[in-house]
From Swiss-Prot:
The lineage of its organism: Bacteria, Pseudomonadati, Pseudomonadota, Gammaproteobacteria, Enterobacterales. Catalyzes the S-adenosylmethionine monomethyl esterification of trans-aconitate. This is Trans-aconitate 2-methyltransferase. It comes from Escherichia coli (strain SMS-3-5 / SECEC). It comes from the Bacteria. It catalyses: trans-aconitate + S-adenosyl-L-methionine = (E)-3-(methoxycarbonyl)pent-2-enedioate + S-adenosyl-L-homocysteine.
Amino acid sequence: MSDWNPSLYLHFAAERSRPAVELLARVPLENIKYVADLGCGPGNSTALLHQRWPAARITGVDSSPAMIAEARSALPDCQFVEADIRNWQPEQALDLIFANASLQWLPDHYELFPHLVSLLNSHGVLAVQMPDNWLEPTHVLMREVAWEQNYPDRGREPLAGVHAYYDILSEAGCEVDIWRTTYYHQMPSHQAIIDWVTATGLRPWLQDLTESEQQHFLTRYHQMLEEQYPLQENGEILLAFPRLFIVARRTE
């Protein structure tokens, strides 16, 4: 599990793209020239940007070779760069930085967010969506299973919080629109929840384990999910998935 799996990620493409659609709808820009899609993955969010601004120069950035290859194949009219978001530098100031479900993987948002704002044109926009599920059972149970089985904590850090992001971006010279939405995804089984998180949040926990250790981890994780997520009357499961949205526009 050394690299991301585009096929597994796109298994829930509609559910993963919906927050990007809703974030994009709140971006207050019309005619723009330069756009970056940070953590573009297989290009599903980049495609939305290209549809809205077909004449813009759109650059997708991702650290995964597999994801970049998939995005290039799907969107030949866009540019894609394999790079670490923290180190990537655009060739010119940007009108829009779009980051859908990517920045939560990176540390030290107190430095990262002002850095991203500095890459914008005057009145440019930073649009961010991040899963805010660190305290949801899906992610709490990952930590509990790892503790039970004496594996190191490899999960991501919790988000800084609404008030912190507002202060960070206000001090960076932005007007800030911030909101939180909880989606309730209809899942056919507990295994479907595992399939979902294996493509994203569960990756760091599994990537350094042997095949036998992975199976042991997933068996226990499945048992604990059954305890936390009861079946609905029709046999499905409602998976609560909170997400934090931020649209910050430079005022100078």
